[in-house]
Design a protein with these regions (language model features):
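The feature marks the mature, well-folded catalytic cores of soluble enzymes
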Residues: 1-282
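Single-stranded RNA-binding regions, centering on S1/OB-family and related RNA-binding modules
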Residues: 281-324
Length: 324
């Protein structure tokens, strides 16, 4: 068995930055809360809760005298303004690539254009992006976009600005662009899929195509982790989505010759290392068992011959002192 770990597995820039801001806040001794989970990984959220940085759900829940840390997915303009109205210290951990999308949709509406957002409507990042628009339109896939455009041909001539959730797949984004290009007369695109996400997905697909089994490590609430599992499933017969090493299906994994490991953008390094370590231990066990099995077979194939014994075989050579 061989185990290969994707080079891109683990924290992306935005997640690393957000986690770093919380860690800095803790080091400075500030009282703080996060507005929603700082990232989509419950292990990280629990870690910070143990350090005194708990999660809240709304601006009204922020205790007096506490700083509020905005999650990496961002928040809507209304939420941001509600925090400012209370005079709270705001530590903005929004991913810079997500903040860029907020600016794009604001400028689009200021110029009389209609933002089209491609992404999962209920995902926190998409909810936040939509919250920076007066009249947001969100489409989860090309089918929904196609139906909306077909329902009223007059929509074809509206000025549209299209953006994507940063963790969307390139396939989804390309298919939506293709649909819009066919009928829309005033259309502009901003390729807002995070490059780290794009590279991670491409690497996962390439690795999955070379493996008998793929392990995708991450929180099940993580959108990019779920998409990685979906991408891997298109290239590999067995895909295991696990939260941590304790969820590994070891009996099935022992049957695989080559195993690949990748992880979502919000998966901590220590969890990836734990999974890799567990698989490496299995690999050592498998190799030892294979060696023992070979020795047993070799022993079974060696038989001591005595004078007078009869054997069945093929003679390949005859010498003065031996027969082969």
């Amino acid at each position: 068995m061989s185990v290969r770990v994707a080079a891109s597995a683990g924290f992306c820039f935005g997640v690393d930055r957000a986690v770093g801001l919380v860690e800095q806040t803790v080091r400075e001794g500030k009282r703080a809360v996060t507005l929603g989970p700082i990232i989509h990984n419950h292990h990280v959220v629990q870690h910070f809760a143990a350090l005194g940085v708990r999660e809240i759900a709304s601006p009204e829940e922020v205790p007096g005298g506490s700083a509020v840390i905005i999650r990496s997915h961002g928040v809507s303009r209304a939420v941001y303004e509600a925090l400012q109205a209370r005079g709270l210290e705001i530590i903005d951990a929004t991913c810079p690539f997500v903040s860029r999308i907020h600016r794009i949709v604001q400028e689009a509406e200021a110029n009389g254009r209609q933002p089209l957002i491609i992404g999962t409507p209920e995902h926190p990042e998409v909810v936040a992006i939509a919250g920076w628009c007066r009249h947001p339109l969100v489409f989860p896939d090309g089918e929904a976009l196609q139906k909306w455009l077909d329902d009223d041909p007059k929509r074809h001539d509206l000025p549209f600005t299209m953006v994507s959730q940063t963790t969307s797949t390139q396939f989804l984004w390309d298919s939506c662009k293709k649909i819009a290009k066919k009928v829309c007369t005033s259309l502009e695109f901003f390729d807002t899929i995070c490059k780290a996400t794009e590279n991670r997905q491409a690497e996962a697909a390439a690795l999955a195509a070379q493996c008998d089994a793929m392990i995708v490590v991450g929180d099940r609430k993580s959108s990019n982790t779920g998409r990685l599992a979906h991408i891997c499933a298109a290239h590999c017969p067995q895909v295991f989505l696990v939260d941590n090493a304790s969820e590994l299906d070891l009996p099935k994994l022992r049957q695989a010759g080559t195993i690949g490991i990748t992880a979502g953008a919000s998966t901590p390094a220590w969890i990836i290392k734990e999974v890799n370590h567990t698989m490496s231990e299995i690999n050592t066990t498998v190799d030892a068992a294979a060696e023992e099995s070979f020795e047993e077979l070799l022993g079974q194939g060696i038989k001591t011959l005595n004078t007078g014994d009869k054997v069945l075989g093929t003679v390949t050579a005859i010498g003065n002192t031996e027969i082969q």
